[in-house]
Amino acid sequence: MNGRGFLIYNGGEKMKQKMIIYDTPAGPYPARVRIALAEKNMLSSVQFVRINLWKGEHKKPEFLAKNYSGTVPVLELDDGTLIAECTAITEYIDALDGTPTLTGKTPLEKGVIHMMNKRAELELLDPVSVYFHHATPGLGPEVELYQNKEWGLRQRDKALHGMHYFDTVLRERPYVAGDSFSMADITVIAGLIFAAIVKLQVPEECEALRAWYKRMQQRPSVKKLLEIRSKSS
């Protein structure tokens, strides 16, 4: 649809909902929501407001009033409702058209997707993030007020173990949570994007993971995201 908004379904009745997303275009966590929006053909309908993490804008009172955790992305609806956390935002946008494609349709699909999505966070994406913030310059000394290099390096090793785990998974099936692309795939993609930023290479022996990621990079939603990252970096 044209304009800044989506047609959503409320008891079978179509309603228009305007949305703002606060993020940073090059961010791996915002990448999760941007890929999901592209998969749902909603990317061009959202108003994006850039938050400069390197200047610490996510720690300022005006942003903390929107998200106590001080993280991006954050979704703001036209009634003032604020939704933070990538999984929650993805759940919301996936259900807007009444036909969820990323978070599962059946209880079984939902359970497996959420399990694998959480594993992608715990075993790959979040450890890479900790490595970035603690064992590299991160966002710079004005933002990174406390660093524990030893902890960061341990999390780097955890991320590498996570890559081996997902390689094992992808030797058995085409996608992270089964036979179709889902939110769990998006989270692994974000983890590998972040790994590339911090120059943490996928091990050569993880052939299935490497082949899967090469295939995912050809997916239109991921291609679009990588173009956005390239222009904003």
From Swiss-Prot:
Gene Ontology cellular-component terms listed: cytoplasm; mitochondrion
Pfam families: GST_C, GST_N_2
InterPro entries: Glutathione-S-Trfase_C-like, Glutathione-S-Trfase_C_sf, Glutathione_S-Trfase, Glutathione_S-Trfase_N, GST_C, GST_Omega/HSP26, Gtt2-like_C, Gtt2-like_N
Listed GO biological process terms: glutathione metabolic process
UniProtKB keywords: Transferase
Alphabetized GO MF terms: glutathione binding; glutathione transferase activity
SUPFAM superfamilies (UniProt xref): GST C-terminal domain-like, Thioredoxin-like
Any coiled-coil regions, as ranges: none
Transferase listed as a keyword: yes
EC number: 2.5.1.18
Effect of G27 to C/F/S: Loss of enzyme activity
Signal sequence segment: none
Residues that hold glutathione according to the record: Y29, H58, V72, E85, C86, H133
Span of domain GST N-terminal: 17-101
Outcome recorded upon mutating S129A: Reduced enzyme activity
Domain GST C-terminal: 106-233
Catalytic activity: RX + glutathione = an S-substituted glutathione + a halide anion + H(+)
Top-level class of the enzyme under EC nomenclature: transferase
Assembly and binders: Homodimer.
Family: Belongs to the GST superfamily.
Protein name: Glutathione S-transferase 2
Source organism: Saccharomyces cerevisiae (strain ATCC 204508 / S288c)
